[in-house]
UniProtKB/Swiss-Prot annotation:
Region annotation Disordered: where it falls in the sequence: 1-30, 174-235
Basic and acidic residues composition bias: residue spans: 20-30
Primary residence: membrane
A family per Pfam: Snf7
Location relative to the cell: Endosome, Multivesicular body membrane
PANTHER family: CHARGED MULTIVESICULAR BODY PROTEIN, VACUOLAR PROTEIN SORTING-ASSOCIATED PROTEIN 60.2
Membrane topology note: Peripheral membrane protein
Lineage: Eukaryota, Viridiplantae, Streptophyta, Embryophyta, Tracheophyta
Protein name according to UniProt: Vacuolar protein sorting-associated protein 60.2
Biological process per Gene Ontology, one example term: protein transport
């Protein structure tokens, strides 16, 4: 059947905007190279015209320079036209990319909208309000429990301002009595070491010689006690 009717030709895909823009830019660059080459020739002719004396030779150089200038103008026109086409293609490409971005944005928004609707079905405002109310009740109960546990025992609640002022005056008087001696409260004064003699209730040692009766001198030993006569020790 293919031999009779022929095979169907596969159509090539149309060129994209980027392909067309690249091809036109390539042509524009080629034309730009030609313009630069003609500029170099014109510079040579300019130098020749300066060095050549008036006459047929000068006219011939001017004619060639005029022909090169016409070619340059033609190539410049083609170059500008190609660059304008490239600019138009760039604008179209920018618009197409913007539409693609808009399509992707719309697709993402639709997907997000669908997902949010599914999530909102499981989350209700009334449930959130009820949960908040329950949390507030629990916090109030917790505060009451803490206050109950922190309540003091055997503390009178009927203390008024007069009682407070009387207590402060009594404290001030006590502190004044403690600081009268050395200007230091008793709780800041150093502790005194107890006297051993006071604790044992022993009599104090004699500080001097006891006076003997008149007319009789009594001998004493080295500790201040009456000396024992030696005769009594022998007997």
């Amino acid at each position: 059947m293919k031999r009779i009717f022929g095979a169907k030709n596969n159509k090539e895909p149309p060129p994209s905007i980027q392909d067309a823009s690249d091809r036109i830019n390539k042509r524009g660059d080629s034309v730009e190279e030609k313009v630069k080459r003609l500029d170099a020739e014109l510079c040579k002719y300019k130098d020749q015209i300066k060095r050549t004396r008036p006459g047929p030779a000068l006219e011939a150089i001017k004619a060639r320079a005029m022909r090169v200038l016409k070619q340059k103008k033609m190539y410049e026109g083609q170059r500008d036209m190609l660059y304008n086409q490239t600019f138009n293609l760039d604008q179209v490409s920018f618009a197409a990319e913007g539409l693609k971005d808009a399509q992707q944005t719309m697709t993402a928004l639709k997907s997000a909208n669908k997902e949010l609707k599914g999530m909102m079905k499981t989350v209700k405002i009334q449930d959130i309000d009820n949960l908040q109310d329950d949390m507030m009740d629990l916090m109030d109960e917790s505060s009451e429990i803490q206050e109950t546990l922190g309540r003091s025992y055997n503390v009178p609640d009927d203390i008024d301002e007069d009682d407070l002022l009387g207590e402060l005056d009594a404290l001030e008087a006590d502190m004044g009595n403690e600081t009268e001696a050395d200007g230091v409260p008793s709780y800041l004064q150093p502790d005194k070491e107890p006297d051993l003699n006071d604790e044992l209730n022993l009599p104090s040692a004699p500080m001097g010689h006891t006076g003997a009766p008149p007319g009789r001198a009594q001998a004493e030993d080295e500790w201040g006690l009456p000396a024992v006569p030696r005769a009594s020790l022998r007997g």
